[in-house]
């Protein structure tokens, strides 16, 4: 019979920051067992704006000797499907193991959604289902995997918090850089305008003088013609 575990956590950060951080939280020194994450496909629905992404995750199997003798391989492969709905502010990640499926099944579903009580917070729900069919050690294997799930979930929350702060800091720095650039351009434009205006003020008397001299010349020529 499968074992289940559900964990809920509130991140006191905007959904946009949390969902962005979810894509960027690995690699992390807190989880050296996660060896690689490769994006297999990515597409955005032009009508709904929903992003769908698939990944291959390879983890180092830090398993006890009794479990290693059953599984054999030292690496675990996982397939993950991610769906991000920016309009409804919900992100869903579904993960399942690709190897050892005849011995052990691990399915995980994570959701990030705007908190129902505070739109500036994010509600995170993490659910795991572990199933084993090995006679005699099935329950022991399932319990071990769930314990590992709970331990890794705690590490994952810390990694998320750190990554969210990093995302927010980068956004602030980008905004500050934009403001600095905009201010610099505005200042240069004002200086150019002032210079052009100052030049115009210097040239205007000369133009007026040239016009006056030209008019005088024309009047003189006109008088001379009349005398003739």
From Swiss-Prot:
- The PRELI/MSF1 domain extends over 1-172
Name one molecular function that GO assigns to this entry: phosphatidic acid transfer activity
Highest taxon in the source lineage: Eukaryota
* Example GO biological process: phospholipid transport
GO (cellular component) term, any one: mitochondrial intermembrane space
Pfam families per the UniProt record, alphabetical:
PRELI
What family classification does the UniProt entry report for this protein? Belongs to the slowmo family.
The protein in question is named Protein slowmo homolog
Q: Which organism is it from?
A: Dictyostelium discoideum
